[in-house]
Regions:
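Hydrophobic h-region of N-terminal signal peptides that target proteins for export
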Residues: 9-18
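Short, Gly/Ser/Thr-enriched beta-strand-loop segments that form substrate-interacting elements
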Residues: 203-227, 253, 257, 297-301, ...
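A small/polar active-site loop signature that marks catalytic segments
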Residues: 209-408
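Beta-lactamase-like hydrolase cores
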Residues: 18-46, 51-58, 118-127
Length: 505
């Protein structure tokens, strides 16, 4: 606690040449035509602020925002936290017939996919269920609103791309269809997976003589068309001749995706459904004099991987969809030592799950004496035009990570320079290679890094650098940030002296 308070005091006082950037970093900013006010940089070695440049400036953090979400989740939910998906019913099973509704309850399971659904449905068959004489109810009510994706405008010109998928509590396969395209000189063949009930695909793409390697250049946003109870995915644009490529697209409504996957999978197992597949908030038709329904019993369940494994996917690969789901989980779930997780009690004062999630993170920040002024949350992933954070706040989170019970789990979630994740191809020939653990972030006009860099004496430094400027594109911003990391990795055991990373006072 004393370290965090001392850090805040150092930043506020502008201690240790705080306003002055190292010559190496200042030169890189100048070469990239990025003005000093477009950069926010904090470097801490223990209790010493080596650099504090615009530390309190509220900036777009891009995906470094995920650090607020992931460290709060690790400390609030714990490393044993696992999300749940359940099949439940209140109906009896008689001669292979489930005489009532079957509920598929979503619990923000990061690993819910077609194979999990197959095994859960197989568990029903193993219990003797073949026919469902009722509805299958898709319960997404853990999050409020239950469908955060509905009514949201596209973030950019690629609404079908994975990074733009907006999760709900019952998202399966991240709502993606895998499409394989094989062309000859005259014909294009398409294969779409997974197999779904009454969902097909066709192409309106023209075959061209373009190189296969540049196939995405003339790809256009796919869409769907409905014909009665059938859905057709339609591809647009053009595609090279004599080319084989595959891609994943998000074009189906979340309800359609799960319903049609569930129907196809259940049919493969020899099952049938006499009723509808509907959402849990749809009206339930029941006789006025119907007897009280007993508490639903568990028929099948799936638990996600433990939280630290999910964090590695979020931070190493900057997975927006998983980060958004985890952010919402902070506002809807708590850890359970037996079940893995359970829903939080309702809070009438906080109407939406995002509000509860933000309250949870701000409470964690307050407990760690990290000032929340200027911090703006949207979805907790950084894929946002409105999320804001200061370099000092991110540095405070990283310091808290070093003092956490779960420091190893948190640090292991970060990309390793020149090794894996979003840092796999960066800093290969410098002293930070294999040693620095860095969360990256980028948007149009934004590039950022936040993490841990051992210096030349192997003393761990907290490093945050954010650039908000139109000139960060085409690698210019990345060069500056890599220069900051390199400067820290070459620095010695003393406080910073301008232009000399190895000097000590």
């Amino acid at each position: 606690m004393f370290r965090r308070l001392l850090f805040a005091a150092l930043i506020a006082a502008g201690a240790v040449h705080a306003a002055e950037l190292p010559e190496q970093v200042a030169s890189l900013l100048q070469a990239a035509h990025i003005p000093p006010e477009g950069a926010g940089i904090v470097v801490l070695r223990g209790d010493t602020a080596l650099i504090s440049h615009n530390a309190q400036q509220s900036m777009q953090p891009a995906s470094t925002m995920k650090l607020f979400t992931t460290l709060t989740a690790l400390e609030q939910l714990g490393p044993a936290f696992r999300a749940r998906t359940e099949f439940r019913t209140s109906a009896d099973v008689v001669d292979g017939v489930l005489k009532g509704d079957l509920v598929l309850r979503g619990g923000a399971d990061a690993d819910l996919n077609e194979d999990v659904l197959l095994h859960m449905l197989q568990a029903l068959r193993n219990q003797g269920i073949q026919k469902i004489r009722g509805d299958v109810i898709l319960d997404r009510q853990l999050f409020q609103p239950a469908r955060p994706d509905v009514g949201q405008p596209p973030f950019d010109e690629y609404p079908w791309a994975y990074y733009n998928v907006i999760p709900d509590a019952l998202l399966i396969n991240t709502n993606l269809l895998k499409v394989e395209m094989r062309s000859t000189g005259a014909k294009l063949a398409l294969v779409m997976m997974p197999e779904m009930d009454k969902v097909g695909i066709r192409s309106e793409m023209k075959l061209t003589d373009a190189p296969c390697a540049s196939w995405e250049k003339d790809w256009r946003t796919p869409d769907t068309s409905r014909h009665g109870d059938k859905i057709e995915v339609v591809l647009h644009g053009s595609f090279p001749k004599d080319c084989i490529k595959s891609t994943s697209i998000d074009v189906l409504d979340h309800h359609d995706y799960l319903e049609r996957l569930l129907r196809a999978t259940w049919r493969k197992l020899g099952g049938s459904i006499s009723g509808q597949v509907r959402e849990a908030d749809a009206p339930v038709s029941a006789a006025p004099d119907a007897a009280p329904v007993p508490a639903p019993r568990l028929l099948a369940e799936h638990l996600s991987r433990p939280l630290p494994e999910v964090l590695r996917d979020i931070n190493k690969f900057s997975d927006n969809t998983l980060a958004r789901a985890l952010f919402l989980s902070l506002g809807s779930l708590e850890a359970d030592p037996v079940l893995g997780s359970r829903p939080l009690a309702a809070d009438a004062s906080l109407a939406s799950t995002p509000m509860r999630a933000e309250t949870a993170i701000r409470g964690w920040l307050q407990n760690h004496r990290i000032d929340g002024n200027g911090l703006v949350f949207d979805n907790g992933s950084g894929l946002s035009r409105i999320e804001r954070a200061t370099p000092a706040q991110l540095a405070g989170v990283l310091q808290a990570g070093l003092n956490s019970l779960w420091t190893p789990e948190f640090m292991s979630s970060l990309p390793i320079a020149a090794t894996d994740g979003t840092m796999r191809k960066r800093l290969k020939d410098g002293p930070a290679a294999l040693r620095a653990r860095i969360k990256t972030g980028s948007l149009n006009g934004v590039i950022a890094i936040a993490g841990y860099v051992p210096d030349a004496n192997n003393q761990l430094c907290v490093v945050v650098a954010i650039l908000n400027d139109e000139h960060v594109a085409n690698g210019a911003g990345r060069t500056v940030l890599d220069g900051v990391i390199d400067w820290v990795a070459r620095s010695g055991g003393g406080a910073y002296s301008p232009g000399n990373p190895s000097s000590s006072k």
